[in-house]
């Protein structure tokens, strides 16, 4: 039995819609339908927040901002319920180009936590944990014009996005350099971090990346438990599939 057969429940953990992220091309409904057609069990909608490339007016009052910013998730969620795709709430936070994926929080929590808007990286970690979520460092070694420097915060993250399909998928036309993933995996190895895989997808032209499990997730908490507990799971960029345990032992080419 191959890895894909062992871990048949695939989740896109890094996805943007044009309703929350300025750089995305498609709505939540369109993304949900495309992911369902591609065989995903579920998706996390992880829009760029106010510190990143959001398309929502940052001057809006907090509750109104969160409501507008969550439209892509709402659209995907409504569609997912109709077509049989699990849709979970997430976020990609930005700090001068350094970005983090947040899992396990809800829109209601965000509305009730306005101090999150001005949180530092350290404060973000504390607040997210208080809200029952986790912080994953997104593509920590990506080099791009909007990232002035690579900054690592091992004490303020729960894990690392080790496989970002944008870096390694043959279908990707941006940020395409597998060395960024290799360095992220090496970083995870050195700190014994859990890893996630996602496509960082911005349109319905999917890469097929994601994190896969041997069971259907019951929700974001199950996702968190499944990657934090030491249980086996799989990571893919849509082309290659890896066992987490094997990836943690594989020496990486770093330059």
Predicted regions and their residues:
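Short beta->alpha connector loops
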Residues: 93-94, 116-120, 140-144
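Short, well-ordered beta-to-alpha junction loops that form the rim of enzyme active sites
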Residues: 48, 92, 138-141, 199-201
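Glycine-rich tight-turn/loop motif centered on a GG-T
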Residues: 61-63, 108-114
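Charged catalytic cores and adjacent phosphate/nucleic-acid-binding surfaces used
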Residues: 1-13, 17-21, 27-33, 96-111, ...
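Conserved beta-strand positions in the central sheet of alpha/beta enzyme cores
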Residues: 44-45, 136-137, 161
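S-adenosyl-L-methionine-dependent methyltransferase catalytic core, i.e., the SAM/SAH-binding region
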Residues: 123
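An N-terminally biased module of ancient metal coordination in phosphate/nucleic-acid-related enzymes
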Residues: 1-95, 205
């Amino acid at each position: 039995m191959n890895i894909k057969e062992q871990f048949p429940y695939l989740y896109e953990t890094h996805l943007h819609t044009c309703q929350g992220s300025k750089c995305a091309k498609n709505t939540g409904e369109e993304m949900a339908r495309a992911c369902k057609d591609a065989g995903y069990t579920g998706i996390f909608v992880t829009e760029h927040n106010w510190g990143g490339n959001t398309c929502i007016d940052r001057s809006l009052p907090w509750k109104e901002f969160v409501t507008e910013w969550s439209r892509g998730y709402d659209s995907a969620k409504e569609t997912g319920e109709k077509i049989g795709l699990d849709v979970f709430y997430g976020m990609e936070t930005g700090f001068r180009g350094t970005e983090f994926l947040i899992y396990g929080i809800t829109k209601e929590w965000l509305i009730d936590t306005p101090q999150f808007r001005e949180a530092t990286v350290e404060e973000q970690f504390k607040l997210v944990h208080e809200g029952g979520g986790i912080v994953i460092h997104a593509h920590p070694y990506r080099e791009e014009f909007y990232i002035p420097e690579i900054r690592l915060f091992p004490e303020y993250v729960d894990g690392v996005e080790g496989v970002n399909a944008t870096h390694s998928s043959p279908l990707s036309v941006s940020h395409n350099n597998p060395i960024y993933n290799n360095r992220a995996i090496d970083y995870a190895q050195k700190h014994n971090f859990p890893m996630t895989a996602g496509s960082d997808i911005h349109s319905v032209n999917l890469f097929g990346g994601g994190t896969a499990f041997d069971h259907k997730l019951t929700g974001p908490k199950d996702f968190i438990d499944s990657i934090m507990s030491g249980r086996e799971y799989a990571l893919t960029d849509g082309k290659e599939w890896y066992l987490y345990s094997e990836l943690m032992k594989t020496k990486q080419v770093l330059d």
